[in-house]
A protein has these predicted regions:
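Aromatic-lined carbohydrate-binding/catalytic grooves of carbohydrate-active enzymes
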Residues: 1-15
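Glycoside hydrolase catalytic-domain groove-lining segments
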Residues: 116-227
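Active-site beta-loop-alpha junctions enriched in small/polar residues
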Residues: 39-43, 107-112, 164-168, 198-200
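Conserved, mostly hydrophobic/aromatic
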Residues: 27, 89, 96, 105-108, ...
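Active-site-proximal loop/short-helix segments
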Residues: 43-56, 82, 99-134
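Catalytic domains of carbohydrate-active enzymes, especially glycoside hydrolases
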Residues: 1, 99-104, 186-193
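Active-site-adjacent "subsite" loops/lids of carbohydrate-active enzymes
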Residues: 13-25, 35-36, 41-99
Length: 227
């Protein structure tokens, strides 16, 4: 992957230093663990800085590949239904664990960026296997999560893999197609979750204590932690 525009202002610049290497070393020097926080599918959320020619997403766009989709506001995302996109994400995680002394790989709560059926209609027609679109999309995310977990453990057993799903469990399942119950109910998906429960105790829709109890109740496998 090319260097981020956030470092120099231009994506793909050659850097005289390795920011991730420095961050990991400085964290460990101070007795801190270092978790690499990633958005697995999101290239950009909206119209912004241009992608460099070496960015895999730009190559997919140029070739007309279904490994990416674009949203009306200029967002660019890897398509969870694309085998090519899954491999890219898994190999990217593998590269981090292999080359850096990170303590964990940690995914943010963004999975499918839209419920629009047009973003993967051809992939669904070819690979849906009789499942509903929603069930097929959840299967795609589950496949990626499971393969990332396996890649992390194959590289370094001590490195943990966790996810911070959205605090609203219904939105996770119905809108983001994130099947958190499967991740927590079966071995081989995650070591922990840290749900983003940004709600007060008296929230009318998602009161903190109730949501926390719901997430905790999904854990059916010994050794999976809830933070």
């Amino acid at each position: 992957f090319p260097s981020s525009y956030l470092i120099t202002g231009t994506e793909g610049d050659n850097l005289p230093f390795d920011p991730l290497k420095i961050m990991v070393e400085e964290a460990h020097n101070r007795g801190l663990t270092f978790e690499a926080w990633l958005n697995p599918y999101r290239v950009r959320a909206r119209t912004g800085k241009a992608l460099c020619s070496d960015n895999p997403a730009q190559k997919y766009i140029n070739s007309g590949s279904d490994a990416v989709y674009q949203t009306a506001n200029g967002g660019i995302f890897y398509n969870p239904g694309s085998r090519e996109a899954i491999d890219l994400i898994v190999n990217g995680v593998r590269e981090i664990v292999r080359n850096y002394d990170v303590d964990a790989i940690h995914f943010d709560d963004y999975f499918y960026a839209t419920t629009d059926s047009s973003i993967d209609s051809a992939l669904y027609a070819a690979n849906g296997g009789g499942k509903s679109l929603a069930a097929w999309r959840r299967q795609n995310v589950n496949t990626m999560v499971r393969e990332v977990y396996a890649a992390v453990k194959a590289e370094k057993q001590s490195v943990r893999f966790g996810i911070s799903p959205q605090g609203n469990t219904k939105a996770n399942y119905d809108t983001l197609y994130a099947d958190v119950a499967t991740w927590l109910g079966n071995a081989g998906y995650v070591d922990y979750i840290c749900p983003q429960i940004y709600y007060g105790f008296n929230n009318a829709t998602c009161p903190y204590s109730s949501v926390l109890t719901e997430f905790n109740g999904m854990i059916k496998v010994s050794g999976i932690d809830l933070y």
